[in-house]
């Protein structure tokens, strides 16, 4: 239905802005073309929503977001606020702002989503702009970008679980941005809820006043009506001047087949209308605005966006190249470039986990490239580099902020674009310190220095570490410490922030963290632990490249840089697993795992054997020996010149999780 409405909007555009409605009456109606000229937009009567927004001064704008640990009820609370303001109908709505299929399937927020709301407080209309942010650490770049368009935040805590690792991380992010924080305790209707404990934790951990907290149940709607007056009273209005030249920040973008790239923008000064000519500070490219509007909660066209507002725009002619939309870029009107100081933009997040992606069918490479580029438009924290493999053909090396980020991106490629892909296991970057003093960070295991180069030219190898913050009940302390120590961890601090809850800090190698550490942590604590982490620099490490050899020929698609303590275990696992997926040949196939020049594991696949003694008389011993020797020599020759053909499906099965 939404797509139909957008198509109707597109088709109903008629006159150029320079033409008047009166001038069109000179021509007979039947001679008028039904196709819209470029840069055209019909002047529709202002809707009731638009009329109400036009009457609201910037002093009655409020831009705020909801931040919390994953699964503490942010999206459900967003639904209740949208219902309370009449933005959506009550009852049948579940996670309206979780618009991706993968979000609804997994029950998590992946993309920060925005929505404008109108709310009447004490007889005056207020324009509220809500951002529902992700809770998981892998999507922190989304959270930090959201803060740029907000003046305050609702800090949400689950009454039954209390403060958890990402609550702490999100608090410090918001605090560093100078946001006004409103404490909210959610899920107070649960039998296991302990609101007083959550309030005490907020006071002790964040020094937030328990008296200012609002206790709600987003599921039942209990006390949710108290939140919006609290937002109006405590969160400051945005600062901006609509009479100044346009200064507009690009916060996010996505791709539409019919409209090209659509931009989500925050206006700091000035205003923007259909037909305005704007220019990008980052690229210098100029565009004509085709439509402006707000998310209410879906795209709702408006005649103007003013300073203080957050809304969407797209251009006519459309912005077709996704690379032109640089998140954090500043736009202004053509001619005002020297009058406007560009905004600082956003800090580029660093990719911490890398995978290689290849199409199952090599002819699908162009489709895979288009699909990845469209998803990157909507997720700028992904890095992209082309690469090729002898075994799997042309593909890409993709960088992500974490393993969940990688998994969600893979799901979106399959679901939204129908991509059939082979994904290699995640790896982390490593640093090479050369003897001439140069440092090089390498993300592709295939580029790891060879044994001779290591001895002659390399001073040391380093791997990245992270500072992990773990929160869990005190009864699991022994198991968690044991898990961290077995993953080469180094304890940094241990504190009790309640009599039963522990905050444990460990420095861990990032390589161990991406090797399903969170799954093992959940298993050790029966699901009660939470994890957050931040970069902690590089450390000298005894690492080497583990690779798979088939008849002494390296398989370039299967290689990984690992710590020496993992070489034996991984090597044995690789050869036994790969053996299952390689077909028998007319000669013996030897599968080896090697770290440098040392073979650490080996498996053999026996050849098909022809019975050369079938027609031989039983008593002819010398003839028997001669035939067997001849067969043996033939096998040696075949093994020396024969190539092992490994099918695509073998790699697919081997690399499957």
Curated annotation (Swiss-Prot):
Promotes mitochondrial protein synthesis. May act as a fidelity factor of the translation reaction, by catalyzing a one-codon backward translocation of tRNAs on improperly translocated ribosomes. Binds to mitochondrial ribosomes in a GTP-dependent manner. Keywords: GTP-binding, Hydrolase, Membrane, Mitochondrion, Mitochondrion inner membrane, Nucleotide-binding, Protein biosynthesis, Transit peptide. InterPro entries: EF-4, EFG_III/V, EFG_V-like, G_TR_CS, LepA_C_sf, LepA_CTD, LepA_IV, P-loop_NTPase. The keyword Oxidoreductase does not apply. The gene is GUF1. It is an enzyme of class 3 (hydrolase). Pfam families: EFG_C, GTP_EFTU, LepA_C. GO terms for molecular function: GTP binding; GTPase activity; mitochondrial ribosome binding. Its EC number is 3.6.5.-. This is Translation factor GUF1, mitochondrial. GO terms for biological process: positive regulation of translation; translation. It catalyses: GTP + H2O = GDP + phosphate + H(+). GTP binds at residues 109-116, 173-177, 227-230. NCBIfam families: lepA, small_GTP. Residues 59-239 form the tr-type G domain.
């Amino acid at each position: 239905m939404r797509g139909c409405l957008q198509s109707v909007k597109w088709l109903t555009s008629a006159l150029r802005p320079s033409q008047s409605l009166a001038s069109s009456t000179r021509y007979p109606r039947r001679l008028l073309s039904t196709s819209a000229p470029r840069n055209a937009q019909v002047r529709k009567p202002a809707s009731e929503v638009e009329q109400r927004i036009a009457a609201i001064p910037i002093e009655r704008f409020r831009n705020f977001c909801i931040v919390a640990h994953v699964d503490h009820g942010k999206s459900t609370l967003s639904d209740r606020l949208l219902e309370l303001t009449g933005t959506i109908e009550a009852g049948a709505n579940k996670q309206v702002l979780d618009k991706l299929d993968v979000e609804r399937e997994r029950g998590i927020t992946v993309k920060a989503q925005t929505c404008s709301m109108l709310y009447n407080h004490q007889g005056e209309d207020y324009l509220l702009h809500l951002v529902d942010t992700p809770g998981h650490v892998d999507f922190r770049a989304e959270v930090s970008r959201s803060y740029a368009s907000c003046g305050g935040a609702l800090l949400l805590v689950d009454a039954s679980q209390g403060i958890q690792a990402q609550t702490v991380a999100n608090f410090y992010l918001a605090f560093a941005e100078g946001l006004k924080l409103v404490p909210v305790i959610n899920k107070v209707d649960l039998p296991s809820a302990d609101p007083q404990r959550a309030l005490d934790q907020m006071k002790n951990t964040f020094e937030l006043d328990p008296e200012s907290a609002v206790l709600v149940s987003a599921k039942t709607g209990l006390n949710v009506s108290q939140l919006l007056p609290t937002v109006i009273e405590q969160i400051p209005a945005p600062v901006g001047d609509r009479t100044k030249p346009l200064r507009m920040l690009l916060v996010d973008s996505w791709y539409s087949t019919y409209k090209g790239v659509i931009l989500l923008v925050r206006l700091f000064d000035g205003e923007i209308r259909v037909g305005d000519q704007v220019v990008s500070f980052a690229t210098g490219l100029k565009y004509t605005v085709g439509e402006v509007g707000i998310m209410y909660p879906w795209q709702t066209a408006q005649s103007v966006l003013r300073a203080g507002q957050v809304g969407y725009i797209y251009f006519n002619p459309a912005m077709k190249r996704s690379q032109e939309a640089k998140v954090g870029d500043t736009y202004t009107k053509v001619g005002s470039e020297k009058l406007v100081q560009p905004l600082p933009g956003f800090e580029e997040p660093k990719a911490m986990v890398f995978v290689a992606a290849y199409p199952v069918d090599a002819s699908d490479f162009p489709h895979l490239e288009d699909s990845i580029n469209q998803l990157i438009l909507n997720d700028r924290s992904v890095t992209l580099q082309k690469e090729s493999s002898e075994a799997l053909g042309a593909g890409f090396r993709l960088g992500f902020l974490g393993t969940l980020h990688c998994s969600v991106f893979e799901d979106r490629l399959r679901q939204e674009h129908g991509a059939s892909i082979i994904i290699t296991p995640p790896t982390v970057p490593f640093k090479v310190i050369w003897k001439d003093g140069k440092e090089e960070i390498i993300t592709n295991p295939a580029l790891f220095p060879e044994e001779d180069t290591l001895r002659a030219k390399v001073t040391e190898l380093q791997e990245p570490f992270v500072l992990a913050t773990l929160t869990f009940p005190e009864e699991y302390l022994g198991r968690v410490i044991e898990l961290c120590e077995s993953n080469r961890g180094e304890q940094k601090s241990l504190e009790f922030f309640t009599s039963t809850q522990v905050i444990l800090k460990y420095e861990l190698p990032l390589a161990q963290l991406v090797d399903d550490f969170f799954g093992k942590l959940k298993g050790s604590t029966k699901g009660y632990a939470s994890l957050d982490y931040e970069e902690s620099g590089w450390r000298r490490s005894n690492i080497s490249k583990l690779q798979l050899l088939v008849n002494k020929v390296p398989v370039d698609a299967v290689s990984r840089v690992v710590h020496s303590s993992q070489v034996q275990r991984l090597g044995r696992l690789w050869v036994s697993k790969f053996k299952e997926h390689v077909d028998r040949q007319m000669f013996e196939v030897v599968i080896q795992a090697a770290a440098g020049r040392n073979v650490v594991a080996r498996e053999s696949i026996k050849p098909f054997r022809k019975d050369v003694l079938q027609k031989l008389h039983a008593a002819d011993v010398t003839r028997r020996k001669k035939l067997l020797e001849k067969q043996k020599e033939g096998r040696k020759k075949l093994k020396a010149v024969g190539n092992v053909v490994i099918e695509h499906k073998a790699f697919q099965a081997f690399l499957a999780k």
